[in-house]
Amino acid sequence: MVSPVVYLVVAALLVGLILFLTRGRGRAAAAAQEPLHNEEVPAAAGRVARPQPLEPEEQRAAGRPRRRRDLGSRLQAQRRAQRVAWADENEEEAIIQAQEEEDIEKPVETHLSGKIGAKKLRKLEEKQARKAQREAEEAEREERKRLESQREAEWKKEEERLRLEEEQKEEEERKAQEEQAQREHEEYLKLKETFVVVEEGVGETMTEEQSHSFLAEFINYIKQSKVVLLEDLASQVGLRTQDTINRIQDLLAEGTLTGVIDDRGKFIYITPEELAAVANFIRQRGRVSITELAQASNSLIAWGRETPAQAPA
């Protein structure tokens, strides 16, 4: 069974269709009667004055109302005017945009001819100023990067130089220590061969510990005595005189002892400080005689001790 709602919808559609057809017929009848009425008015007016002929463009078409023709003409004119205005506006915008793009590349001086306004000129100047500022900042950043790279390269170069100097210094110190150890070992071998204790006509070679101890006592005895007779020193330490002289010369060459051996067979021990004082005296006086040097040495060099040290046994 069909729902009542369907019947209601169909009835509403039929009523709407009837109203639409009725209204359409009324409009058609009114449009047909209007030309007849317009023709009667000029005929009656022709008895008084002859009507002027109409222009071709003002003649209306058959069956077309004047009002509708005028409305269409106005709409067409408005559309044409609107299209022209839109075309002009788009053309003006394109020209302005192209001119702005061209003005960005041109210097500001080219716009001083008065063809553009002050406001636009100010905007262009601001754009140019911002562009110049960006370029200056970019150049400053590049220069800063270049300087930082240069400083970093210099730092690395300086670090490398210091590292090489440190390595060279360590190598020199290592070689000096090795050479010192080698000299000490050679000196020990010489002392071991030379120092002989003569006891009851039988010579015995000293041990390593005895040799070091004997050498220390030998040097200490000379330093405390200041002036020693080489023959007496040789007899006291149990060495031959020539061996004693050779040992003292070796110690002088090594820098262990400082002093002089005179022509009377004596060794005079002089400390490095006393040697510096004598050298300073000679340098200050210029030319010095032996007598003056001997007199000055009495005050510059401490001769002997109140209690001389005992010679090594």
UniProtKB/Swiss-Prot annotation:
A motif (UFM1-interacting motif (UFIM)) lies at residues 194-208. Residues 40-88, 130-185 are annotated as: Disordered. Residues 215-313 are annotated as: Mediates interaction with UFL1. The chain crosses the membrane at residues 1-28. Keywords: Endoplasmic reticulum, Isopeptide bond, Membrane, Phosphoprotein, Transmembrane, Transmembrane helix, Ubl conjugation, Ubl conjugation pathway. The modification Phosphoserine is found at residues 73, 113. The keyword Iron-sulfur does not apply. It is a single-pass membrane protein. The keyword Ubl conjugation applies. Residues 73-87 have a biased composition (Low complexity). One of its GO terms (biological process) is response to endoplasmic reticulum stress. There is a cross-link at residue 266 (Glycyl lysine isopeptide (Lys-Gly) (interchain with G-Cter in UFM1)). Residues 29-313 are cytoplasmic. SUPFAM superfamilies: Winged helix' DNA-binding domain. InterPro entries: DDRGK_dom-contain (IPR019153), DDRGK_domain-containing (IPR050899), WH-like_DNA-bd_sf (IPR036388), WH_DNA-bd_sf (IPR036390). Component of the UFM1 ribosome E3 ligase (UREL) complex, a multiprotein complex that catalyzes ufmylation of endoplasmic reticulum-docked proteins. The UREL complex plays a key role in ribosome recycling by mediating mono-ufmylation of the RPL26/uL24 subunit of the 60S ribosome following ribosome dissociation: ufmylation weakens the junction between post-termination 60S subunits and SEC61 translocons, promoting release and recycling of the large ribosomal subunit from the endoplasmic reticulum membrane. PANTHER family: DDRGK DOMAIN-CONTAINING PROTEIN 1 (PTHR48176:SF1). This is DDRGK domain-containing protein 1. It comes from Bos taurus.
